[in-house]
């Protein structure tokens, strides 16, 4: 009976003992890994930027623009670069789009595989470590210019203070991970401008609505100075995407919600004198 059930399955699936799906692929068929697949189609490819994240009282938010570029051309205007990876985490990628999509899908399966094998979900630190390993596995393609950098957010269920349980983890191209203590971070070509904006706008004690507005405004500022970043497109009604993580789980904002926030940001900025930001003391 056992032979009949196992008929057709490669021996690797029956003898491999690991909770890591990435390690299983390395053993079974390394060509299925993102770096190997990308090598087959190496050449000029679309790149995506910019991703921003910020904590608030009780959670953390992730937002991303919708533009992808290929050289000096706009390759896409409505690309979603954010993914909910499980109930309490999400990831956004900047860099080569094809590799980013493969790495994100692999990370989602990695988390699901671990939970099925071990019977419990990975800790937040464990999730970021697994993502770091996936990024490190793409090092050969990164050296060839096909870089993909993630920005990871999550809610720490083991945090002593639920109001400060939101976490942001960034990575470099070789897989090193850094937990952001400042409460905000940005990656991609527009990140210097987005971070400068968040440095003034971010308030870790604010609610999710105020933080979402700050993130959309940061993307607006990035798009103002970085041609590879797409801000709110008021003509085509294309707006940034955003994900919220709290103790209740992950939530993806609807197009209607994001449109309302973007409209308010653009209206507020349009009311200012051109080229000058006005700040009012509270």
Swiss-Prot record:
Pathway: Protein degradation; proteasomal Pup-dependent pathway. CDD domains: proteasome_protease_HslV (cd01906). GO terms for cellular component: cytoplasm; proteasome core complex, beta-subunit complex. It catalyses: Cleavage of peptide bonds with very broad specificity. Belongs to the peptidase T1B family. The keyword Hydrolase applies. NCBIfam families: 20S_bact_beta. Its main location: cytoplasm. This is Proteasome subunit beta 1. It comes from Salinispora tropica (strain ATCC BAA-916 / DSM 44818 / JCM 13857 / NBRC 105044 / CNB-440). GO terms for molecular function: threonine-type endopeptidase activity. Keywords: Autocatalytic cleavage, Cytoplasm, Hydrolase, Protease, Proteasome, Threonine protease, Zymogen. It is found in: Cytoplasm. PANTHER family: ATP-DEPENDENT PROTEASE SUBUNIT HSLV, METALLOPROTEASE TLDD. The formation of the proteasomal ATPase ARC-20S proteasome complex, likely via the docking of the C-termini of ARC into the intersubunit pockets in the alpha-rings, may trigger opening of the gate for substrate entry. Interconversion between the open-gate and close-gate conformations leads to a dynamic regulation of the 20S proteasome proteolysis activity. Its EC number is 3.4.25.1. The active site is at residue 49. InterPro entries: Ntn_hydrolases_N, Proteasome_sua/b, Proteasome_suB-type, PSB_actinobac. Residues 1-48 form a propeptide. The 20S proteasome core is composed of 14 alpha and 14 beta subunits that assemble into four stacked heptameric rings, resulting in a barrel-shaped structure. The two inner rings, each composed of seven catalytic beta subunits, are sandwiched by two outer rings, each composed of seven alpha subunits. The catalytic chamber with the active sites is on the inside of the barrel. Has a gated structure, the ends of the cylinder being occluded by the N-termini of the alpha-subunits. Is capped by the proteasome-associated ATPase, ARC. Component of the proteasome core, a large protease complex with broad specificity involved in protein degradation. PROSITE patterns: PROTEASOME_BETA_2.
């Amino acid at each position: 009976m056992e032979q009949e059930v196992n008929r057709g399955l490669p021996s690797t699936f029956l003898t491999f003992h690991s909770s890591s799906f990435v390690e299983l692929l390395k053993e079974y068929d390394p060509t299925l890994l993102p770096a190997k697949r990308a090598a087959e189609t190496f050449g000029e490819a679309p790149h995506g930027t910019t991703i921003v994240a910020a904590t608030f009282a009780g959670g953390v938010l992730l937002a991303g623009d919708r533009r992808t570029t290929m050289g000096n051309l706009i390759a896409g205007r409505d690309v979603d670069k954010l993914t909910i990876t499980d109930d309490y985490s999400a990831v956004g990628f900047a860099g080569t789009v094809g590799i980013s999509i493969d790495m994100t899908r692999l990370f989602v399966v990695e988390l699901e595989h671990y939970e099925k094998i071990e019977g419990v979900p990975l800790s937040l630190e464990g999730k970021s470590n697994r993502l770091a390993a996936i990024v490190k596995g793409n090092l050969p393609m990164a050296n060839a210019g096909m870089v993909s950098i993630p920005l990871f957010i999550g809610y720490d269920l083991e945090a002593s203070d639920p109001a400060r349980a939101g976490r942001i983890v960034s990575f470099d191209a070789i897989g090193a991970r850094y937990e952001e203590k400042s409460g905000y971070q940005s990656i991609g070509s527009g990140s210097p401008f987005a971070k400068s904006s968040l440095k003034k706008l971010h308030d870790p004690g604010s609610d999710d609505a105020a933080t979402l507005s700050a993130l959309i405004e940061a993307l607006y500022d990035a798009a103002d100075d970085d041609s590879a970043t797409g801000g709110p497109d008021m003509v085509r009604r294309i707006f940034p995407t955003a994900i919220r993580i709290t103790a209740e789980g992950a939530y993806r904002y609807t197009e209607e919600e994001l449109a309302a926030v973007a409209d308010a940001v653009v209206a507020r900025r349009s009311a200012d004198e051109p080229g000058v930001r006005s700040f009012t003391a509270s």
